[in-house]
């Protein structure tokens, strides 16, 4: 997904049967990016370019430490570029993640909160979930890992948007999360 275009967001909403909201939401997101630019947006865009694209051979969205790829999937050079890009999108508030065997430890242990929530939110299998205040998408990914058919993720932070797209672009197959 082109981070600044959002045409994929619009088509995703249509696929979910949310036609009425597709253009409205995409236009609002475009407006936020245009009218409230973050001074770090260019840096984060460059950081996204350093991250590998579609190279993970496997993903585990149900693990406490979400796993994208495995050790040895990347060349040493690509791994160093990835680590540099991830550092440039600091701080990482939600997680943890394992990206091609490299731990990405966040400020908050979201896996511990998920453990408390998981038994109280009901069965997610086949459900469409709205994740308001999704941060970088950690919980959205865990919901997909728990069987949600799709997640619509909303957060006003442009950093979290970049972090989410950075994680997802490394996956071989994009999860049904619409941020």
Task: Tell where the protein language model's regions lie, with residue ranges.
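S-adenosyl-L-methionine
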Residues: 168-179
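Conserved SAM-binding loop of SAM-dependent methyltransferases across substrates and taxa
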Residues: 136-147
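Conserved alpha-helix/loop element of class I SAM-dependent methyltransferases that forms part
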Residues: 107-127
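Short beta-strand element of Class I
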Residues: 149-154
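Conserved SAM/SAH-binding beta-strand->alpha-helix loop
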Residues: 157
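N-terminal accessory regions of S-adenosyl-L-methionine
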Residues: 1-110
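Conserved class I S-adenosyl-L-methionine
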Residues: 127-135
């Amino acid at each position: 997904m082109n981070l600044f275009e959002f045409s994929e967001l619009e088509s995703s909403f249509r696929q979910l049967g949310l036609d009425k909201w597709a253009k409205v939401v995409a236009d609002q997101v475009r407006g936020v990016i245009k009218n409230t630019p973050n001074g770090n947006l260019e840096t984060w865009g460059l950081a996204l370019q350093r991250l590998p694209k579609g190279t993970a051979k496997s993903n585990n969205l149900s693990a406490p430490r979400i796993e994208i790829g495995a050790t040895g999937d990347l060349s040493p050079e690509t791994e160093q570029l990835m680590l540099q890009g991830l550092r440039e999108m600091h701080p990482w508030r939600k997680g943890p993640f394992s990206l091609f065997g490299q731990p990405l430890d966040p400020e908050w242990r979201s896996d511990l909160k998920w453990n408390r929530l998981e038994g109280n939110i009901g069965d997610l299998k086949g459900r469409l979930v709205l994740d308001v205040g999704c941060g970088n998408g950690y919980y959205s990914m865990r919901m997909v890992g728990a069987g949600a058919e799709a997640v619509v993720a909303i957060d006003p932070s442009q950093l979290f948007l970049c972090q989410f797209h950075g994680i997802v672009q490394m996956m071989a197959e994009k999860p049904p999360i619409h941020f």
